[in-house]
Amino acid sequence: PAGDVLLLFVIAGLVLFFTRNWGDGAILAAAVVFLLQPVEWYHCIAGLLNPAHRLPDLGVGEMYARVAEYTKAGNFGDFILGNVTLGQKASLLWAVNAGRFVQTAGLFLLGFYIGRKQLFVATEKNLRFWVKTLIVSAIAFAPLYTLRELVMDNGAVVGQTAGTALDMWQKLAFTLVLVASFILLYQRRKFSAAVAGLRFYGRMSLTNYLSQSVIGAFVYFPFGLYLAPRCGYTASLLVGILVFLLQVRFCKWWLGRHKQGPLEYIWHKWTWIGTDK
């Protein structure tokens, strides 16, 4: 319940502003550097060379304990106030602690590079690229996952640093498997027709993300219906599917009457404030 990932995206997204005029090669190189998790490897090497080396204590555990207190209390006003103050701080510092901040910057740059190279355009060359990506990522996932499990058991500092880096890598490999698989399957008419509704959902991703958060908080938290203690995995999955289907219907209805989602429109206007766009 603490904070929101959008704060992380806003801060990490500044890397795109500073690299917007870089060449493709420089952007890809910067993405690789970030994705290698240099901060985690620094602490890992420092811990191996000096057993007394300790990771920075950002107090995330204590902050999340306080977040749990006001969330369980069920006071809506305290929840909102805590979430926009302490919750945001806890969420952001957790991301820094867990390697997510550097990872996010790297993923933004990787997405920037993919967009520049137009790799999502269904050309023969690009499809060959995604086939290779699928093969390499699928092969890399298993050893990365296994190595991550082994490293996690190898002492506190090594497990929390090298383990974090390897965890990010195996997740990146799995993500690329999913992305490449989707792109290749999308070339088949039946599959593309089956998932056609997702394009409406994607065009309103910000609106959907925030509305999901609001609905989820009302359904599960103490200030709302408080179904968390009574909903198991299956019930929660069904709730998620129901909310998703309702959102898809709403997106189709809204985009039939407007060019953008409501929050996407506000984001666009604020992004280009002072211009005619």
Tell me the role of every PLM-derived stretch:
Residues 6-19, 99-122, 170-189:
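Specific transmembrane alpha-helix
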Residues 139-148, 200-227:
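Kinked, hydrophobic transmembrane alpha-helices enriched for aromatic residues
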Residues 231-277:
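C-terminal "closing" transmembrane helix and its immediate cytosolic amphipathic cap
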